[in-house]
Swiss-Prot record:
Organism whose genome encodes this protein: Bacillus subtilis (strain 168)
Protein family according to the UniProt entry: To B.subtilis XkdM.
Top-level taxon: Bacteria
Gene responsible for this protein: yqbM
UniProt-listed InterPro entries: DUF2001, XkdM-like_sf
Name the record gives this protein: Uncharacterized protein YqbM
Length: 147
């Protein structure tokens, strides 16, 4: 069977959970895994070889500014030394696609930075971008792999 237009998944049909609590004010979310590689020079070859030696998990979430949640997380670190780690779960669930649901769970998520104040006279809705790292992930529910 061939791909049909209705099989594509709408980016609007998703949810994000932080330690089980839905983050309804999410606008965009992206998590990436990048392999760490070492260069290996091999005798008799002009091209450099590469050996995978590990992986690194990073991401960015953009939220509509409706709470002080990330400001308080950063303040707790600065004032008290408390640096919490979280679990994030991203859910894709576009019923009209017929592809099922995908859940990706990120473990040991730590936020790198947060905007602690911001004003913008031209903005219709204030946003805050929060970069993060994570140390493990799982895919407990996958989209269909066949059409």
């Amino acid at each position: 069977m061939a791909l049909k237009a209705q099989n594509t998944i709408s980016g609007k049909e998703g949810r994000l959970f932080l330690d089980g609590e839905e983050m309804a004010h999410i606008k965009t979310f992206e998590a990436n895994v990048e392999k760490n590689k070492s260069e290996v020079n091999i005798m008799g070859r002009r091209m450099t070889g590469h050996k995978t030696t590990g992986a690194n998990g990073t991401g960015t979430a953009t939220f509509y500014k409706v709470t002080s949640q990330f400001v308080l997380i950063m303040m707790d670190y600065v004032k008290k030394g408390s640096d919490p780690y979280f679990t994030l779960q991203a859910v894709l669930d576009d019923a009209s696609s017929g592809r099922g649901t995908e859940r990706v769970t990120l473990y040991d998520v730590n936020f790198d930075s947060a905007k602690i104040a911001g004003l913008d006279v031209d903005s219709e809705a204030l946003e805050e971008e929060v970069p993060f790292t994570f140390e493990d992930f799982d895919v407990p529910e996958q989209l269909k792999s066949t059409f």
